[in-house]
């Protein structure tokens, strides 16, 4: 028997060494297989990144050409897109040249260096032109902004000049003035055409800029000649007021045109360079696209030139599979050997199990006095465990007997308590029903309070509206009094001027009275002289008497006028005093009305505050009514819960009675166990 075991031990050791060797071969082949595939996967990822960057270079080359053309045309957003495309191209190109640490991408292999060199040459030229366009961004945008403003201003100049021509024709202006005005409209059209040629940026842009400067200068000189006259240019000054106003408006519009001449002349060469750079980019972009495509093809051809490829991986996979098959064969042979040993061991264990079953056969009948024999076989531990279980079962049966007695006593006491709780729950349900009815009555009262508060709020709101209308009436009254005061002041001023005029009339009347007195004296002297002349002066004496009578009548009339003037002055002064008093009363009335307006505003504020408070009371009453309803519902729920509790307590009492019965049945169920002598039986 020992020789057989030693042979089995030697065979097991030899099988283990063979399996270990095969496992080593398997692990090495798997490691090499994964290393090969990892290398291929890494190189494949690198190739994908190279190809992706090369493909993006093709797209970016065309995007740069498109954005450069749009930037040269003056589109502001194109400059940002051009800059982004240029920077993106340079970033991706630097990654292809120097690698990318963030993605562990190495520089491009030497195999694609020829394609890289030709792309580098085209990129250097394209980048230089793109940088030139980006450096001129402000110049290009400013020039296009000026041109856009000119495109709006010059048509306005033409419209204004057409109106000037119409005005001159309607008023019969000289033909040379009309012809000059018409030429100005045509000259403005030519200025706009020159600006558009400058923006084109072709070989004629510099010449167009010079033409723009000359035409703008000529337009300004002719405009000034029409405003002020210019003999050297044979332009006469426009004198029609309406035409002069139009020329002044034209001069204001032309200030921007004349101010833009220098800027356009200075920046037009830069715009030509930008256009030339955009054209260069467009011509190079197609070549760069082709060369970038060749570079992408070069990256795609890298995989075929590597020394380690999929065939090596397949060979390592076959080696690993062969190792697995050999390991399986060795393990099958080892398993058969162990199965034979296990069969022999099972026979010995079967005999020990039968012996143990004979010893514990009485345990199935409830005899807890039996004990199993502990041997050195594997059943020894089982026998020891069975003996321990029998001891624990003895203690359990004893504990069940004691517990059943205690449970029966506790169940009877608990049943009595549950019945008392059921009676208390019924009484509590009756009290809750009464409280719920009282809460419902309180909710009805709160609803009535809420309705009264809502009505009071409506009354307060009407009070606010009335106060607001009263305030508007007071403001209208104040406005009317202010108008009356202004009219009274105007009337007072007119009456004062009437008094001053009457004073002047009085002065004139006094002068006439003095003249009448002097005329009377002169007539008297003439009569004396005529009487002294005798018959020769008789006719003159008659005239002198007539003059004297006229002087006396004039003196009497002037006295009457003087009396009337004094009466007018007196009435005027009284009217002025009355007007001033009326003005004072109007001012006082306006102040009183203003005070009334302030009082009404206070009433309005108080009414609004009162309305808000009443509204708050109404809201609070509604909330209380809602809360009362909620409390009522809660009380109903509590009443229902109490009813359920009462029913549950009654059911609990019945369950506790059943528990007492179950405790008795449990004592009966363990009464069949046989315990050693000296232990209390159930």
UniProtKB/Swiss-Prot annotation:
PROSITE patterns: CHEMOTAXIS_TRANSDUC_2 (PS50111), HAMP (PS50885). It is found in: Cell inner membrane. Residues 403-639 form the Methyl-accepting transducer domain. Residues 347-398 form the HAMP domain. The chain crosses the membrane at residues 15-38, 307-333. It is a multi-pass membrane protein. May be a part of a signal-transduction system that regulates twitching motility by controlling pilus function (extension and retraction). Belongs to the methyl-accepting chemotaxis (MCP) protein family. This is Protein PilJ.
């Amino acid at each position: 028997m020992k020789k057989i075991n030693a042979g089995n031990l030697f065979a097991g050791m030899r099988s283990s060494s063979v399996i270990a060797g095969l496992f080593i071969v398997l692990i090495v082949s798997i490691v090499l297989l994964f290393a090969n595939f990892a290398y291929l996967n890494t190189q494949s990822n690198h190739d994908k990144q190279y190809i992706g960057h090369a493909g993006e270079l093709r797209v970016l080359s065309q995007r740069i050409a498109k954005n450069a053309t749009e930037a040269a045309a003056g589109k502001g957003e194109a400059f940002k897109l051009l800059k982004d495309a240029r920077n993106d191209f340079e970033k991706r190109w630097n990654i292809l040249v120097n690698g990318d640490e963030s993605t562990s991408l190495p520089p491009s292999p030497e195999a694609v260096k020829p394609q890289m060199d030709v792309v580098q040459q085209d990129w250097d030229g394209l980048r230089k032109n793109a940088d030139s366009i980006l450096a001129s961004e402000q110049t290009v945008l400013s020039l296009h902004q000026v041109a856009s403003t000119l495109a709006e201003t010059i048509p306005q100049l033409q419209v204004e000049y057409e109106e000037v021509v119409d005005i001159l024709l309607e008023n019969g202006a000289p033909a040379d003035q009309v012809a000059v005005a018409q030429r100005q409209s045509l000259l403005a059209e030519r200025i706009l055409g020159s600006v558009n040629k400058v923006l084109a940026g072709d070989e004629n842009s510099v010449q167009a800029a010079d033409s723009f400067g000359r035409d703008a200068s000529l337009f300004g000189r002719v405009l000034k000649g029409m405003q002020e006259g210019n003999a050297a240019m044979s332009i006469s000054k426009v004198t029609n007021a309406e035409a002069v106003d139009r020329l002044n408006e034209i001069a204001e519009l032309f200030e921007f045109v004349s101010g833009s001449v220098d800027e356009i002349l200075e920046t037009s060469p830069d715009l030509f360079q930008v256009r030339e750079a955009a054209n260069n980019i467009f011509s190079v972009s197609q070549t760069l696209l082709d060369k970038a495509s060749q570079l992408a093809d070069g990256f795609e051809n890298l995989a075929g030139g590597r020394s380690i490829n999929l065939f090596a991986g397949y060979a390592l996979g076959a080696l690993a599979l062969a190792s697995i098959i050999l390991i399986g064969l060795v393990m099958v042979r080892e398993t058969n050997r162990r199965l034979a040993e296990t069969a022999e061991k099972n026979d010995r264990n079967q005999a020990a199990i039968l012996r143990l079953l004979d010893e514990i056969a009485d345990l199935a009948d409830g005899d807890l006095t039996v004990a199993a024999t502990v041997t050195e076989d594997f059943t020894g531990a089982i026998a020891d465990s069975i003996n321990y279980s029998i001891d624990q079962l003895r203690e359990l049966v004893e504990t069940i007997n004691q517990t059943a007695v205690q449970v029966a006593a506790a169940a009877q006491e608990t049943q009595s308590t549950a019945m008392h709780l059921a009676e208390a729950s019924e009484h509590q349900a009756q009290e809750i029903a009464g409280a719920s009815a009282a809460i419902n009555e309180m909710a009805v009262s709160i609803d009535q309070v809420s309705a009264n508060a809502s009505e009071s709020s409506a009354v307060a709101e009407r009070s606010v509206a009335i106060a607001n209308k009263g305030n508007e009436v007071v403001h209208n009254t104040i406005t009317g009094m202010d108008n009356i005061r202004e009219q009274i002041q105007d009337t007072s001023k007119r009456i004062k001027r009437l008094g001053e005029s009457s004073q002047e009339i009085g002065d004139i009347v006094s002068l006439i009275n003095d003249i009448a007195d002097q005329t009377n004296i002169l007539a008297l002297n003439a009569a004396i002289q005529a009487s002294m002349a005798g018959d020769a002066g008789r006719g003159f004496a008659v005239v002198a008497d007539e003059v004297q009578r006229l002087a006396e009548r004039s003196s009497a009339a002037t006295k009457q006028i003087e009396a009337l003037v004094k009466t007018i002055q007196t009435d005027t002064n009284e009217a002025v005093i009355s007007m001033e008093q009326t003005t004072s009363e109007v001012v006082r009335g306006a102040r009183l009305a203003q005070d009334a307006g302030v009082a009404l505003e206070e009433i309005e504020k108080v009414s609004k505050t009162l309305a808000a408070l009443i509204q708050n009371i109404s809201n609070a009453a509604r909330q209380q009514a809602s809360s009362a309803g909620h409390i009522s519902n809660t009380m109903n729920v509590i009443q229902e819960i109490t009813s359920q509790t009462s029913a549950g307590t009654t059911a609990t009492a019945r369950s506790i009675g059943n528990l007492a019965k179950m405790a008795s049945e449990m004592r009966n169920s363990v009464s069949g166990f046989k315990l050693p002598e000296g232990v209390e039986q159930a």
